[in-house]
Amino acid sequence: MEVIEGKMPFMGYETYYRIVGRRSEKTPLVLLHGGPGSSHNYFEVLDKLAEIDNRRIIMYDQLGCGKSSIPDDHPELYTKETWVKELMALREHLALRKIHLLGQSWGGMLALIYMCDYHPVGIQSLILSSTLSSASLWSKELHRMIKYLPIEEQAAIHRAELTSNFNDPDYLKANEHFMNQHAIDMTKTWPECVMRKKCGGIVAYETAWGPNEYTPEGNLHDYEYTEKLGKIKIPTLITSGTDDLCTPYVAKTMQDHLAGSKWQLFENCGHMSFVEKTDEYVEMLRKWLDQHD
């Protein structure tokens, strides 16, 4: 399978991108990774879609992580505005006039910000993978799920939030347990690209989001896009897992505000259903993309 790697100049730094598959008449799919700061790595499980569907897939590392520049000495760069500009620059750099756009977790937030605030042209369809339209609802739902943890783990998380001490061993153990339950269970063996150690991303995550998934106190703390979703008029597919950080309530809230959208719920999956049920996810994407080219 053909893979092209490159770097794009951006704001005096460099953005790494990876293109999978040969050029064809089909509209390419651009993938926006989560975090902020998670890097493209886990998206490599979707490489097979390029071959199966004869469609180019483009993924990249957002500024602050992976193989892109990591200007952690300038955390003021880690904002939604920077990352939207980077996406726009990548489209121009690679001449991506028409695309399908998939965003996972924070990547879905980035896609919604891009769609609602910048009104881009040439987006054939939108795939919102385990994402959110409201930071406050997300936090509320995750705190509800924390109540299902053992009492001592609940107490450790509560204590960390009260004291802002997120280095306490009891908190770290409780948070790891929570994330293994609802993000992805890292005690299991996954494809190499999922297990691969990430470069950077911590400063970007803590600056933009916060110390963990359920305490959004970074510059995205006021991310509230539910009431803006009506601006999106293109075909939209929402995907999530039954055990996801993106709870069914979070996913249904988005669907209710996106006219004509579809929602695919993956049974027994957490925050990365495309990793846990790759073949099923790829087939769903193939059908969706072919329908909306």
Swiss-Prot record:
Domain AB hydrolase-1 span(s) in chain numbering: 28-277
GO molecular function list: aminopeptidase activity
Alphabetical keyword list: Aminopeptidase, Hydrolase, Protease
The enzyme's E.C. designation: 3.4.11.5
GO biological process, one term: proteolysis
Predominant subcellular localization, coarse grouping: other
Compartment(s) where it occurs, according to its Swiss-Prot or TrEMBL record: Cell envelope
Function: Releases the N-terminal proline from various substrates.
Family designation: Belongs to the peptidase S33 family.
PANTHER family: HYDROLASE, PUTATIVE (AFU_ORTHOLOGUE AFUA_2G14860)-RELATED (PTHR43798:SF33), MONOACYLGLYCEROL LIPASE (PTHR43798)
Protein name per UniProt: Proline iminopeptidase
